[in-house]
Amino acid sequence: MDSDFYRAYLLHRRPYSDSQVMLDMLVEGVGQLRMLARISGRQATKHKAQLQPFQALLVHYNGKYDLKYINKFELHGTPLFLKGDELYCGFYLNELTNRIVPINEPIDQVFQLYNTHLKNLNSGANLQAVLRSYEFQLLELLGYGVDFSFDASGEPIDEKRTYSYFAEVGFLVQDDPRSGFSGLQLNAIANHDFSQADVLYMAKQLSRYLLKPLLGNKPLKSRELFAASQ
């Protein structure tokens, strides 16, 4: 393998011109990059077939500015075949990553995090648990992680108490145990242990709250597709 080739996954693609496509790629050791690839000539059909989601690629690119240019690319390993709910979850991973990971900022650990969780979708694991694990770890990498060890007053999270979460404040103890997060649930979320249904449910509520400022008002298409399929 050429030393200038990088492992990458396609997150999003769209037409750019009659002979070029614009690609948002997650590149190992680099982060998310926006690239142009020429798709024309006798190899056009082959190249279009290779530029698919969930297929690991080796890409060779150049360009000093925001937009990079792919010189060569080739398949790397066998494609990951997702179907049913696995496929919708894969689309969600791609769209979420594409939307909240900054382009052209060096966040080198995102590729490995994505690669691991993408493969976990195809492993028979609880799909919702895989998504929650990815969301919380991705938020941590991007600097939006939550401190699950201490509440807003600096006291350790107590498994027997109930908490509410407030952005830029943290967890505050509340008196009503019928709502909010139990300390036991928070400790489980911190350890990415989503084996209990109540923990998985509360983790989803918290992750959506944390992701909303990053996603803005534009809905995720993958969520809409999944909802329509049910």
UniProtKB/Swiss-Prot annotation:
GO CC terms for this protein?
A: bacterial nucleoid
Record flagged with keyword Acetylation: no
Keywords on record: DNA damage, DNA recombination, DNA repair
Name the Gene3D superfamilies for this protein: Nucleic acid-binding proteins, Recombination protein O, C-terminal domain
GO BP terms, alphabetized: DNA recombination; double-strand break repair
Quote the InterPro entries the UniProt record gives.
Answer: ARFGAP/RecO, DNA_rep/recomb_RecO_N, NA-bd_OB-fold, RecO, RecO_C
Q: Which Pfam families match?
A: RecO_C (PF02565), RecO_N (PF11967)
Fetch the SUPFAM superfamilies from UniProt. Answer: ArfGap/RecO-like zinc finger (SSF57863), Nucleic acid-binding proteins (SSF50249)
Give the record's family classification: Belongs to the RecO family.
Q: What does this protein do?
A: Involved in DNA repair and RecF pathway recombination.
Its name, as the record gives it, is DNA repair protein RecO
Provenance organism: Pseudoalteromonas translucida (strain TAC 125)
